[in-house]
């Protein structure tokens, strides 16, 4: 039976592993928000951890809103933070998967 008759008319495709699909899906959902996308770009270019207070000033958002965005980025495995006094300082995770790092680097 010809491939076309079996419903296969193209070159076979290679699918991503299920775990990788779930991981990339979470990353892409987190980056789908314009504010979070810009926050990740800022963190990518930063030479040291960035204080949440700097995001509050830069975006004109409340501290709880910025913290919500950072929590979403943390849940997606993109950022880590440390508490210093009353503020949290954030940076991109150093152990990002290669595909995630390449995606972030491609942001410009």
Predicted features, each with a name:
Residues 1-31, 76-78, 104:
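N-terminal leader segment of winged-helix/HTH proteins
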Residues 18, 22-62, 84, 88-95:
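N-terminal helix-turn-helix DNA-binding core of bacterial DNA-binding proteins
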Residues 57, 74-75:
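Alpha-helical residues within the helix-turn-helix
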Residues 59, 70, 100:
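Short amphipathic alpha-helical/adjacent loop interface patches that line ligand
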Residues 67-71, 86:
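Base-recognition residues in the alpha-helical recognition helix of bacterial helix-turn-helix
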Residues 95-101:
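Short, charged/polar, Gly/Pro-enriched secondary-structure boundary elements
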Residues 101-108:
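Short, charged, intrinsically disordered terminal tails
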